[in-house]
Amino acid sequence: MNELIEKAKVLQEALPYIREFHGKVFVIKYGGSAMHDEELRESFARDVVLLKYVGINPVIVHGGGPQISKTLEKFGIKPKFVGGMRKTDEETMHVVEMVLSGDINKDIVALINRYSGEKIYAVGLSGRDGRLLKAKKLDKERYFSELGLPVPEEDIGFVGEIVDVNEELIFTLLSHNFIPVIAPVGVGEEGEAYNVNADLAASEIAGEIKAEKLIYLTDTKGVLDEKGELISSLSKDKAEELIKKGVIREGMIPKVRSALRALEKGVKKVHIIDGRVKHSILLEVFTKEGVGTEITLE
């Protein structure tokens, strides 16, 4: 009986959050261990379906770096990185698109649909479908300068940045009870494909559709302080300060930068959470304590 009472308390705790976020859009960047561990995959899918059934509209953007590297090696192509970004020549771009749009995307769609029932369906999209993600070649000078990193001289190939999002397509799908699952492959003016960083894609999509929340699933607890302890709440100014001090460093810098960009474009809150924790999305969104770092403008 006590266990049942505790479960009831959990539902009661979630109620005000369900009421507050009903009808709102959450963009979720899906990556890391949550994509590979079977229990975490199932936990993620169930969480996404639950969000939809309680009236929240999830939009999923996924990565796939490790799978791309493995597939390139199978084809005898050695993965190359320039300044931490995958050098994407034409041959590599074909593999990137094949893995992201054809393999990973459809696997995630099937996973969510396993739990979604008869009224809700996940649908897979590439950024090239319906010109969902219009892109151009990444301005590497601006990108690396903003991160405080030296600008590499080597050409990065078909690495892109998003210049426009087909909001109408996303909202049409959401209004018809679909859960969009988006592969971060952009389309250029001439129809060429671009490899877009999934964090940046999620940030741009969230900003353009003015999402209530942008949630990053990661393989870390969140943003950590000087002692390695989790920072539960972070403002834009504090984030900038921690970047300058070197507390926020390495791979967390571009993630936080993309979070700040989303906030500046109208997203209410960004959450960087530990995707290694089962049901981390629900714990972050529907409990007072949360399980990651919440980032806001002020």
Curated annotation (Swiss-Prot):
A UniProt-annotated Pfam family: AA_kinase
Keywords: Amino-acid biosynthesis, Arginine biosynthesis, ATP-binding, Cytoplasm, Kinase, Nucleotide-binding, Transferase
Residues annotated as transmembrane: none
Role this protein plays: Catalyzes the ATP-dependent phosphorylation of N-acetyl-L-glutamate.
Reactions that this protein is recorded to catalyse: N-acetyl-L-glutamate + ATP = N-acetyl-L-glutamyl 5-phosphate + ADP
Protein name: Acetylglutamate kinase
BP terms from Gene Ontology: arginine biosynthetic process via ornithine; L-arginine biosynthetic process
Organism for this UniProt entry: Aquifex aeolicus (strain VF5)
Lineage: Bacteria, Pseudomonadati, Aquificota, Aquificia, Aquificales
Chain residues that bind substrate: G64, G65, R86, N195
